[in-house]
Amino acid sequence: MTATPDIVCRDLVRIYRSRDVEVQALQGLTLTVRPGEMVALVGASGSGKSTLLGILSGLDTPSAGQAVVADVDLGALTRRGRTDFHRHAVGFVWQQTSRNLVPYLTIAENVAAVLTIAGVRGRRRAARVREVLALVGIGDHGDRLPAALSGGLQQLAAIAVALANRPRVLLADEPTGALDRVAARAVLATMRAVNEHEGVTVLIVTHDQTVAEQVRRTVRIRDGRTSTETIRDDLGASPGEEFAVIDEAGRLQLPESFQQALGLRDRVRLSLQDDHVLVRRGDDEVVR
């Protein structure tokens, strides 16, 4: 039996109104993330990736379409349901440390606060705090304030806070955006370890291609839609096999590098072969 996906987006549309002008940030985006996957969602500024993360985190609602995370239909959440969703179903790691950690609490107290809100107290809480700090490799820093830690260690602490209540899904928004290369690799390695050993589904939203090279599956988003996917057999090796995504309306976006290399623009010719589709420039002569 196939496991139910942890993240499902079906034809998501998000329209904003700014000064009487409508901006369509998402244009029928479709995405599926299976349990235990670690996926990077990559896109340029304005591609819609941050809008998507806002919806998946339950902080925003789509104008149309459906988003389901950890079996929770985000479009049907009540206020109580949204609170339960944030406490138990998902964890968040944001780029800005101020959104991850309370500055006047120690790292251990930050983790403990999440557990206290969820009703976990006493020895169970203390044990979970020790467990999760050790899991992310900062067990010796629990008594320190966030300001006493480097940016990389602060992000590891943020991962610990996000994992405190054993969520099914971890959402990360540019988690390495403010870090140097060494610290960024340590944060990504920790996320991989959490993904592999805890079975937590991880979705990383980023514009950084080097982040994409550290995960097995990369989904690119462009113009508010998923455009291509890359699957890697070996992390850190050469680029993996490239996939194009066909949405439910039958639309397909070719990788931009393919378009540039072959001079594809405006219209292209399609020919159905035995086991593939041949794509040629629209100005090529038709082979008879």
Give each language-model segment a name:
Residues G65-D73:
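Conserved ABC transporter NBD signature motif
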Residues L145-L149, L153:
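Conserved ABC ATPase signature
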